[in-house]
Swiss-Prot record:
GO terms for molecular function: actin binding. This is Spermatogenesis-associated protein 32. GO terms for biological process: spermatogenesis. Disulfide bonds: none annotated. Keywords: Phosphoprotein. Abundantly expressed in testes. Expressed in germ cells, but not in Sertoli or Leydig cells of the adult testis. Localized at the acrosomal region of the round and elongated spermatids at stages VIII-X. GO terms for cellular component: perinuclear region of cytoplasm.
């Protein structure tokens, strides 16, 4: 029907057709890549153009962002931490202040208690040093803490034991062991002298210490109260350890008689002139019954040893009313509780 093959195109040969087709193919093949390349270049250009402005714009916001980051890291965090810490501190300070207030309110109470105890002790000591006189019954009441020393007590014991007319002696430890059953009696402390001492002689010695160490002149003025009375000794008994044990003794205590010339002098002058050789001998030894110039009086009472610390500042000081010539290193405190009464004249 139709003519096929190359003979159908009389105006075109095989070579021409092939060349044309190749040229067209090459043109098309080369043209499309160029267009594609141009399109890609245009796209890349647009992309580059779109990418290039951000670097120009980025330097401005980037410092702001860094500043904001630094501000966020520096300022807001301490602001958020400080209120918490401040609140925590405030909450912790309040109970601490309450504890301080409670402790401060408690300490003055304890101090007040101690001060009241000290005041009570001072009142008690003042009571022990009081020396009222009962003129109606001619009795003298003395309850006083006397400072003696081991040296003065030992010398007094030696002088007393040398005397020929020595009475039956009772050891101090024995006296206090017998008195332990008494509820009001205090526990006996250790005495540095192991030698035995009679109870009456001990009270006699204590009374002589009371006479010698009295700062006021009321105690030596007892000579005026017993002046003109009978010189005979009166036997009296004292229940020393009532009601369990009772010790009966007879003792005449002698008190220095002060002349009327010294009584007329003021107390200040008498206090300076009171320490004569006679009073010193009386203070450091037992009173001799046979000594002239002395009056007799009946003593009634008890003597207790009080244990005190050796480092006490009150004991280390030399007081005006302390016994002169005594050692303050090893003091012995005697709690004297006795009465002195003038012997009554015999009834006619």
């Amino acid at each position: 029907m139709g003519v096929t093959g190359f003979s159908a195109f009389p105006c075109c040969g095989k070579n021409s057709v092939n060349i044309v087709e190749r040229k067209n193919d090459d043109y098309h093949h080369h043209h499309h890549p160029l267009e594609d390349n141009k399109d890609e270049d245009n796209e890349m250009g647009t992309e580059l153009s779109s990418m290039k402005p951000p670097p120009k714009v980025d330097p401005d916001p980037v410092p702001h962002l860094e500043d904001m980051v630094t501000e966020l890291t520096s300022t807001p965090i301490p602001e958020t931490e400080n209120p918490e810490q401040q609140n925590y501190r405030i909450e912790s300070i309040k109970p601490y202040e309450e504890e301080l207030t409670t402790t401060n309110t408690f300490k003055p109470r304890g101090f007040n208690v101690n001060s009241t105890n000290k005041e009570e002790e001072e009142v008690v000591c003042g009571h022990f040093r009081s020396t009222p006189v009962q003129t109606s019954k001619h009795l003298f009441w003395s309850n006083k803490l006397i400072q003696a020393s081991e040296h003065s007590l030992q010398t007094a014991l030696e002088k007393h034991h040398k005397s020929p007319g020595e009475k039956k002696s009772i050891s101090i430890a024995q006296v206090y062991t017998e008195c332990t059953q008494r509820p009001s009696s205090t526990q006996v402390s250790r005495t540095p002298t192991p030698t035995a001492l009679g109870l009456a002689d001990l009270i006699n010695f204590a009374s002589s210490l009371a006479v010698a160490s009295s700062s006021n002149m009321a105690l030596p003025n007892l000579g005026t109260m017993i002046k003109g009375t009978s010189e005979k000794a009166q036997n009296t008994s004292l229940d020393f350890c009532q009601p369990i044990q009772s010790i009966k003794f007879t003792q005449a205590t002698q008190i220095t008689q002060i002349s009327s010339e010294k009584q007329d002098e003021p107390p200040e002058v008498m206090a300076h002139k009171s320490w004569t050789q006679e009073t010193r001998n009386v203070a450091c030894s037992y009173l001799d019954i046979n000594e002239s110039g002395l009056k007799k009086a009946t003593i009634q009472g008890e003597v207790k040893f009080v244990q005190a610390p050796a480092t006490s500042p009150e004991l280390q000081e030399d007081k005006d009313d302390s016994v002169p010539g005594t050692k303050k290193g090893t003091p012995i405190l005697l709690k004297i509780h006795f009465k002195l009464s003038s012997p009554q004249a015999p009834e006619k």
